[in-house]
Amino acid sequence: MKNIIDVELRTRTVDFSQCKTDLLVIGQFSDVERLDRLTRELDSKLDGAIERLIKLGDFKAKEGTNAVVYGNGRIEAERVLLVGLGEKKKSPAELGEPRFTRGPLDTVRKAAANAAKKAVEMKMGSVSLALHKAFGGQFDLSAMGRAMAEGTYFGSYRYDEFVTDSEDGRLDRLKVEVIDSDSAKTEKLNRGVSRGVIIGKAQSYARTLTNRPANVINPAGLAAAAKELARDYERLSCTVLDEKQMAAKGMGGVLAVGSGSQNKPRFIVLKYNPPNKTASKWPTVALVGKAITFDSGGISIKPAEKMEEMKLDKTGGIAVLGTMKAVAELQLPLNVLGIIPAAENLPSGSSYRPGDIITTFSGKTVEVQNTDAEGRMILCDGLSYAVKQNCNIIIDIATLTGACRVALGKYMAGLMGNDDKLIKQLQTAAEDSGEKVWPMPSGDEYAQEMKSKIADLKNIGSKWGGACTGAAFLRQFVGDAKWAHLDIAGVDVFDKATEFTAEGSSGFGVRLLTTYLMNLAES
């Protein structure tokens, strides 16, 4: 098996023209005719090669584009990579916003991802990033550093773990540095880079676990990964309930979904213990992630086309794992509980059936009308567990409904909840992290559709508003806790490679949830 590309990222103070590297990366806006000072200085040493490239129309600087200019011994860098930044965003003063203005941060993140992906394709061993210079110092350098680090990990990622054919010159390691000629600026960049490295590594970790197929990662395998994570970080502890222990507690939702598979379900709990004696006074945040390690639909079986992608139905649970990894590394001053109900949804003689009535961990009964609406069946037990642990804030994340993908496409996750402040905090975190969300309703009108005539609830509503009725079902299990639901169906996977990253799992949710927790800790 191949190892995932190992990225080493640091900051360095160095004059740009004296930076010895395979690839020096700078940014250019599409609607700014005059080159920034750094680019002008480089271009003067390159005999105007950059300006000629732009004037000839060979590089239009649109977002997601790039062009290579060779150093030819005129500068220390072997190559200069021009990365398109698209149209220039207004300055913070013009926008009336703080210096960490969010739009440009995602521009920088995407540009770094584009550059890292290009570096991997070109098999460049060393890369130096100076993307922040195009913004002229208008934005917070720490935030810029974090965005560049996150983008570097996102763009350099590729999943070829089980490809046995050798690839000539395949990169095993990519050395990246964020550079500036001013040591004070480098120090500010470094504060953000150090955080971005932690978050970027956590997202890559989540992408790899999610990409692994169901014969490699089943519920027990996911539990083993959680235990390994807890061994790696002293502030994490892990508890795993097997099917007998779940039965003793009455976790009927998870048990029903997993009943058809020989790979029995697991209920995984990761607890983060913060490094502060006053932690008992702080609220506890629960992250609840759906982990269906393979979803055939059960007896209500899915079409064969694209069923292989159903290994990705564990994305929500693994996003929680990745977030817990980042939280432990960052040592945030918060109480955080990661709850991951894990099961495999397969048809067999022992599967749960349409028409069955299931008693969940909360005591509420659910009429099963479709076994392919299984995510909510396991999440309701996870949410009830969080309530019984007296968690003040509960956020669940799941590839819950195809309806959400129909509504929002592959660009945004659906965001629902019962607390306006929490919703706004998650929207802010989405803007900060570049993982976009869109608010959707889940109120009483939708809850009415989930009532059953022969049980407390049924597990599907009508064909209309499926993302909203799915969230309304989950809402019945959160009690008085502040709750938010992220439906990430649609944003969980890249069907094909983009200008910014490889195809496969996106790792969506790790940056968003970690950013939310970082913002909460700072507030």
Positions of predicted regions on the chain:
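Short amphipathic alpha-helical segment within the helicase RecA-like ATPase core
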Residues: M1-T284, V288-A291
